Amino acid sequence: MLDGLDLAIEPGATALLGPSGSGKSSLLRLLNRLADPDRGVVHFHGRDVRELDVLELRRRVGLVPQLPAPVPGTVADNVRYGPGLEDLSVDPAPPLRLAGLDPSFLERDAGRLSVGEQQRVMLARALALEPEVLLLDEPTASLDGDAKAAVESALGGLRGLSIVLVTHEADQAERLAGRIVRLERGRLVT
């Protein structure tokens, strides 16, 4: 539960750092309208997000979940999966490259990839939306060292987005974000 939170997300990368249960993932859910606040308001470009069309908001605010959840089908199908991406003319190769995977992966079965590769497909899916804001919920939590390094490398190469990275790893926050916001028990502590 969040309490009295007043936070502006600006261009560049912001890390939300805190222990489990501190409200980091809850905040991401509010930013992408996977949940609405019980009280208070979440603004996007000065407008209450509850006044915005949910699908339009989710096109503008991409989300990479903690655990990859590919849909049945190819990597290309998965990159094209999401609000506004049903148009098969969307080229999945550029976002896949940005996410650190070669386009040779496009015809592979997404369900047969490693967890690290699946996580990069989830990143490519979010990037295919060409979002203004990218939300990352512990994107490397379930990855081994090599896969984690590959995802971090892909994230480090992104430019022109507002990125919100949820992590409990201070070193990762320092590597990837220009701004670190600490949460404890639903409150800002910095």
Describe the role of every protein-language-model region.
Residues 32:
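Helix-to-loop junction immediately C-terminal to a conserved catalytic motif
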Residues 40-48, 57:
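Conserved ABC transporter NBD signature motif
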Residues 67-77, 81, 86:
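Conserved catalytic motifs of ABC-family nucleotide-binding domains
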Residues 89-105:
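Conserved ABC ATPase "signature" region
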Residues 109-113, 117:
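Conserved ABC ATPase signature
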Residues 123:
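Hydrophobic anchor residue at the start of the ABC signature
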Residues 134-138:
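Catalytic Walker B motif of ABC-type/P-loop ATPase nucleotide-binding domains
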